[in-house]
Amino acid sequence: MYRFNGGGSMKHSIMVWVYVCLAAFTLAGKTLAYDVGAAVAFSEDPEDVWFNSVSQFVEIISSEPTWVQHFLNDYPNVGPYMWTEEEKGNDNFYADYTELSLVLGHGVVVVYPDGTKKSAIGFADRGYALPDDIRLGYASPDGFGYSVWTFIIQCSVLGDEYVDDWLQTLQGVHMVLGFASTATISNADFPELAYRLTGTGGYTREKVESAFFSTFLKSDGVHDDNRARIIAENSEVLDNDYLNSFERVPVDGSKIIVTGWVG
């Protein structure tokens, strides 16, 4: 069982082989297909254990009707440019082109001279992506964006101290899904998440919110201490978004935060 707590900060509080503490190419227009993409930003991945797991995630999603693989990058062919916004930026070929994107790696905390701290998506020695530079969705400053959900599978990027900085990244993207704490995950998690989203592999199709929490929050000796967190545009997308059932929603200031843990 997991728990929730709502409003400004809802609480929702997950099998294991190997586990770790984590941590359309022209822009003229989209086809009728939806796109999925993923990046594995570990500089250390013996025998490609994590890359193979994330590859399964992408393969399962792209096996769904109307879904196609758009990118699947492994270290060292990764970098903050895949998620950061700039005029005619490269995010338009990666996270902001795909309806569903995922990045796996180690989160980063940047400490400024005045003592201010911000979390960032880590890309090993390729750099990091700060929330100040990420704008996902159709209302992005450059007027481009198809992003609907982005999964940040890295430790503490959406931690209590940092989460408010990430609210501004929602510019049409429905949800940013990550962790409010150190996260322990299994390489079995990524195919499981995809199976839950697609209703295959012996699972019933689940909402995006439920699939995420059910995968990463379990009393199984691995995921027990995780605190998973979702930033959402509004409660409507939390309650209704499925992989093949979602609609564009207006962008405004009414973001919500949902946090979950086992209990």
Swiss-Prot record:
InterPro entries xref list: DUF6345
Protein name: Uncharacterized protein AF_1566
Highest taxon listed in the record's lineage: Archaea
